[in-house]
Amino acid sequence: MVLVTDLDASLDFYCNKLGLVETNRKEFEAGRFTLVFLAAPGNLDSAKATRSPELELTYNWDPEDYDGGRNFGHLAYYVDDIYATCQRLMDAGVTINRPPRDGRMAFVRSPDNISIELLQEGDAQAPAEPWASMENTGSW
């Protein structure tokens, strides 16, 4: 579960930019929070049948600061093409904090500053530009 501060910005990032799909949403008016469940496109059948693997976003309606790592450490996802994924994210305005210089791994951050690790499915791709010479940006 990841606590988010802006549900719309988080859904834009996780769905429109990262490519996850919303599988379920529950509003809890009495508790004043919303749960949104997301899955990778390749895991939709499993997510709908067994609710796994899914990412749960929790949005508390009343503003709250999540300091001291209360919202999470980092998430990791396998992707079919690390270079194409990073290019798509950059084109969507996402900063690549740790570029995939090795053709295997990259890091980005969500709107709530959650570190997202992207891993190449299968063998690493051959190092390629512009990634091989791209510097780190910020931290991950």
Sequence positions of predicted segments:
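Eukaryotic phosphotyrosine signaling hubs
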Residues: 70-74
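Core segments of cupin and vicinal oxygen chelate
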Residues: 1-52
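Short glycine/serine/proline-enriched coil/turn segments at secondary-structure junctions
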Residues: 29-30, 65-67
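Short, charged, solvent-exposed linker or helix-capping segments at domain edges/interfaces
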Residues: 46-54, 68-69, 88, 119, ...
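Vicinal oxygen chelate
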Residues: 23-26, 34-37, 77, 83-140
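Short, well-ordered beta-strand elements within core beta-sheets of diverse protein domains
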Residues: 2, 75-77
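Amide-forming acyltransferase catalytic core, primarily the GNAT-like/NAT-type
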Residues: 60-63
